[in-house]
Amino acid sequence: MRSSLLTLPKSFLGFMPLYLAVEIVLGISILNKCSGAYGILALFTGHPLDFMQWIAYLWSVFTLIVFSQGLYLIHKPNLLVFSQICVLYTIDTISTCFFTLWFTTQWFTLEDTANIDGNNALQSNPISTGKLTERGIDISKQSATESYEYTMTILITLVSLIFRFYFNFILASFVQELLHHPKYLVDRDDVEQNLKNKPIWKRLWAKSQKGCYKLCKNLLE
């Protein structure tokens, strides 16, 4: 048996068993992905969604289904299912970094535009000098508050991403443990035999799981 390409944690924070850690990780992820299902409800309220929001919300709904399946099977783990979860969680981590960067950039751009518009309006209004000075003080305080908000937003985002990557390693470690346990080994011939008379969407889903299993086996075993 060749060694894994990765050195992964064998417990959560050094004391919690992997299966409990995976249960926590999936539970947190499911709660997080519920925001995607909630975002889709914007269709019924008439709130406009741009293309990136559509992608983010639809992906959240899809991963919500996959992660829920894993949470249901955590005490009777299936290697195919958890291989798929591990790969999708990794893709989700990468996409989360991308969407975080995208939406944060959009937010900062809107805030800067609003500040510029406010300053232009202030300069163009014929108001008294006393009011102008008072307004200038308010803008200075507002700028300091916004700088603090930006710093805290970036800090919280970075901490969240660090935990996200750690959760990813926990899932990979759990799949690695399943790969090393004979009880959970997958017989590919049996899988193919069971799929012959299944609907096409089930066959495609099973092929996706098999592809994820092969990838995890190559990287983690």
Curated annotation (Swiss-Prot):
Tell me which family the UniProt entry assigns to this protein.
Answer: Belongs to the KEI1 family.
Instruction: Report the function annotation for this chain.
Output: Regulatory component of the inositol phosphorylceramide (ICP) synthase which catalyzes the addition of a phosphorylinositol group onto ceramide to form inositol phosphorylceramide, an essential step in sphingolipid biosynthesis. Helps the medial Golgi localization of IPC synthase in a COPI vesicle-dependent manner.
Q: What else is known?
A: Present with 3420 molecules/cell in log phase SD medium.
**Which PANTHER family does the record associate with it?**
INOSITOL PHOSPHORYLCERAMIDE SYNTHASE REGULATORY SUBUNIT KEI1 (PTHR28077:SF1)
- Organism, scientific name: Saccharomyces cerevisiae (strain ATCC 204508 / S288c) (Baker's yeast)
Cysteine disulfide links: none
Q: What's the subunit arrangement here?
A: Component of the inositol phosphorylceramide synthase complex composed of at least AUR1 and KEI1. Interacts (via C-terminal region) with COP1 and SEC21. Note=The interaction with AUR1 seems to occur with the full-length protein before cleavage by KEX2 since both full-length and short chains of KEI1 interact with AUR1.
Per its record, how is this protein called by name? Inositol phosphorylceramide synthase regulatory subunit KEI1
